[in-house]
């Protein structure tokens, strides 16, 4: 665990050639340290100050200082934020002066960690900050903002309250077995109450698992025969020349990857080697990889040429896709006539036309969004978690609740039921940060940016 008694400093903006850099100091000595660098001192109060900063008698910079007094700050400590002129040398020089005068460099996420430890934010809010910073699309951004603000955290508090009520009823029954008239402590009443809590937890888990696919990225394989336009499609989707495109069959021999972020969904794209019969050992290894990636993909974009759709290679790919989520992509649409389009319409229902070489891929984007964007998630105003560690904790809560419910219905001794309920309670506390392991907390905040 970081030493909370030390005053820390870090840049809150990237150190680069830019107009303005922001530097944050947090800790008991924040005002003392900054005043060592000023001829005209600032008071220990919430305010904004324009000051000249000195190293001894040498002018360093003219800065704007925003000061906050404990506990009314992000970290809950005395905080001084300095807006100085940008530039790598100037920013680093000021940070070095602050360290020289009594601060130490903050670790990654240490400001947020102090905010959590000083009860300024709970753990869901802290994770929400990181979700917001690393958001890849609008859905992730919305969830990050909601969780950072604590807008929906009351739902966890309510779950805890309802669970504690059940635990208390059971404990009374254990401690006073002769009293059989404790309100709400009969087996049917306990089972009903537990079922309600379990349903809420299941709904939270369902929402979160649906959302995390869209926010973290859906593993999307681009597959097909050689020379049907797979690499051109990847380049068009990424809007860059990531993959080599030639008229020579078998150009792509290894896996080429990229990422595309749409409004409410992200795709982790994988361009695979063209699938065909070959005696080339290197190309054959690439084809083996392609077939393996089809198995692992969550979405497959199967690129085909209409004129060869029924040949052996395509039939083999169709067989691999029997139980997969896929879109049939008729690329080079400029060469498909109306008669051929009518035949396609009669034979297939999940297809799109594209012309990657002309960047005409809007139909494909729309189809992907239709298949994977759930309006229930987009418009949902309830708590959604998009962090794997949080989802794991919710799964543990669900597991203990279901064990307890099955035990009650199965006539198990009530004290055994209470053990699982106490564990569910502990996991809810860990989720919101009211109960934690110091090493786990350190690991959580190490994922954050320096200065956050």
From Swiss-Prot:
Q: Which PROSITE patterns match?
A: G_TRME (PS51709)
> Would you kindly state one Gene Ontology biological process term found in this protein's UniProt entry?
tRNA methylation
**Positions contributing to (6S)-5-formyl-5,6,7,8-tetrahydrofolate binding:** 24, 81, 120, 452
* Disulfide cysteine pairs (residue numbers): none
GO MF, one annotated term? GTP binding
CDD domains, alphabetically? Answer: trmE, TrmE_N
Keywords from the UniProt entry: Cytoplasm, GTP-binding, Hydrolase, Magnesium, Metal-binding, Nucleotide-binding, Potassium, tRNA processing
**Residues annotated to bind Mg(2+):** 231, 252
> Which InterPro entries does this UniProt record tie to the protein?
G_TrmE (IPR031168), GTP-bd (IPR006073), GTP-bd_TrmE_N (IPR018948), GTPase_MnmE (IPR004520), MnmE_dom2 (IPR027368), MnmE_helical (IPR025867), P-loop_NTPase (IPR027417), Small_GTP-bd (IPR005225)
Q: Which positions does UniProt annotate for GTP binding? A: 227-232, 246-252, 271-274
Subcellular localization, as worded in the UniProt entry: Cytoplasm
Protein origin, superkingdom: Bacteria
Cofactors (names): K(+)
Q: Does the keyword Transcription regulation apply?
A: no
What GO cellular-component annotations does this UniProt entry give? cytosol
Q: Which residues form the TrmE-type G domain?
A: 217-373
According to the UniProt entry, what is the EC number of this protein? 3.6.-.-
Q: Where does it mainly reside?
A: cytoplasm
Q: Does the keyword Nucleotide-binding apply?
A: yes
Q: How is the cofactor bound?
A: Binds 1 potassium ion per subunit.
Residues reported in the UniProt entry to bind K(+): 227, 246, 248, 251
Protein family: Belongs to the TRAFAC class TrmE-Era-EngA-EngB-Septin-like GTPase superfamily. TrmE GTPase family.
Q: What's the stated role of this polypeptide?
A: Exhibits a very high intrinsic GTPase hydrolysis rate. Involved in the addition of a carboxymethylaminomethyl (cmnm) group at the wobble position (U34) of certain tRNAs, forming tRNA-cmnm(5)s(2)U34.
Record's protein name: tRNA modification GTPase MnmE
Q: Which organism is it from?
A: Mesoplasma florum (strain ATCC 33453 / NBRC 100688 / NCTC 11704 / L1) (Acholeplasma florum)
Phylogenetic classification of the source organism: Bacteria, Bacillati, Mycoplasmatota, Mollicutes, Entomoplasmatales
Gene label: mnmE
């Amino acid at each position: 665990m970081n030493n909370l008694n030390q005053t820390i400093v870090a840049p809150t903006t990237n150190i680069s050639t830019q107009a303005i850099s922001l530097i944050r100091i947090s800790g008991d000595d924040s005002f003392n340290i900054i005043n060592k660098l000023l001829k005209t001192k600032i008071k220990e109060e919430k305010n904004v100050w324009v000051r000249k900063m000195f190293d001894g008698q040498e002018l360093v910079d003219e800065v704007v200082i925003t000061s906050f007094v404990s506990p009314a700050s992000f970290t809950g400590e005395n905080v001084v934020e300095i807006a100085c002129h940008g530039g790598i040398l100037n920013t680093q020089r000021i940070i070095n002066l602050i360290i020289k005068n009594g601060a130490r460099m903050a670790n990654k996420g240490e400001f947020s960690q102090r905010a959590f430890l000083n009860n300024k934010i709970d753990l869901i809010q802290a994770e929400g900050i990181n979700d917001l910073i690393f958001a890849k699309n609008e859905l992730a951004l919305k969830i990050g903002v909601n969780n950072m603000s604590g807008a929906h955290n009351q739902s966890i508090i309510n779950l805890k309250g309802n669970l504690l009520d059940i635990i208390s009823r059971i404990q009374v029954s254990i401690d006073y077995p002769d009293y059989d008239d404790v309100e709400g402590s009969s087996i049917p009443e306990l089972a009903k109450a537990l079922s309600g809590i379990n349903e809420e937890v299941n709904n939270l888990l369902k929402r979160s698992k649906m959302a995390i696919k869209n926010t973290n990225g859906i593993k999307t394989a681009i597959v097909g025969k050689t020379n049907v336009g797979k690499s051109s499609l990847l380049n068009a989707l990424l809007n860059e020349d990531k993959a080599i495109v030639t008229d020579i069959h078998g150009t792509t021999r290894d896996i080429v990857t990229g990422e595309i972020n749409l409004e409410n969904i992200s795709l982790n794209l994988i361009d695979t080697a063209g699938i065909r019969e070959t005696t080339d050992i290197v190309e054959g290894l690439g084809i083996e990889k392609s077939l393996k990636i089809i198995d692992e993909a969550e979405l497959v974009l199967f690129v085909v040429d209409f004129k060869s759709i029924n040949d052996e290679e395509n039939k083999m790919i169709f067989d691999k896709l029997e139980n997969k989520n896929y879109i049939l992509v008729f690329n080079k649409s400029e060469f498909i006539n109306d008669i051929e389009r009518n035949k396609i319409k009669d034979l297939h229902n999940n297809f799109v036309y594209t012309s990657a070489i002309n960047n005409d891929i809007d139909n494909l984007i729309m189809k992907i969004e239709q298949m994977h964007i759930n309006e229930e998630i987009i418009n949902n105003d309830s708590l959604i978690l998009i962090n794997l560690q949080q989802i794991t904790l919710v799964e543990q809560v669900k597991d203990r609740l279901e064990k307890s419910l099955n035990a009650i219905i199965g006539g198990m001794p009530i004290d055994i039921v209470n053990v699982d309920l106490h564990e569910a309670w502990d996991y809810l506390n860990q989720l919101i940060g009211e109960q934690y392991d110091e090493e786990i907390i350190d690991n959580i905040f190490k994922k954050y940016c320096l200065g956050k």
